[in-house]
Amino acid sequence: ALPSMDDPFVQDQLTHIKRLREAIQDETAVFYNVFNPVSTLRSSTSDELVYDHLERREPALFEAITRVNEFKMEFMHRLISDAGVTGMFLPMQNNDLNGFTGACYHELLRPYDLSLVQEANRLSPYNIIHLCGYWGVPNRLENWKDFPCAAMHWDVHTDKLSLQDGRKYFTKKKAVMGGFNNKEGSPIYLADRKAVIE
């Protein structure tokens, strides 16, 4: 069962973020990491279980996705109203080239992810969408091309899309972001401090 907003875990999260916000005041923005619902279900159960239910179009899975999304939406509201979060950092997953087909994501999962993003945008104009590429598997970026956000962030090394090209590609963002390569074997792992700074 999902926790209520009165659950100690939820309240602890809100308390910690509120203390952080009070400590830094307006010195910097504060973003909270809110994964999409299917990623939460995968980490709570297993990839195999979720993908098996997805392939069979099990109604129970879609009911679970809906419930998780509803919890996340309510939690985002509390993060902003009670804890003073600036916006959300919304990692998108389950749309990579090694997973099920892009059409499957578009038809079955995209509506849930988009509704989560839209609710975040209703609560705050300062949300960042992150397109996960950590494991080095390229994403089907076309499924996220029109997601609205203040900033779109992706792994330029995995998805082979430069920031300049991404500025044109993503149609409903205000800004683009991209970081250094953070995978094993990259300079962040192997180089000395000087090389990392450069």
Which role does the model predict for each range below?
Residues S4-E198:
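Active-site loop segments of alpha/beta catalytic cores
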Residues A1:
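Active-site gating loops and adjacent loop-to-helix segments of metal-dependent hydrolytic enzymes
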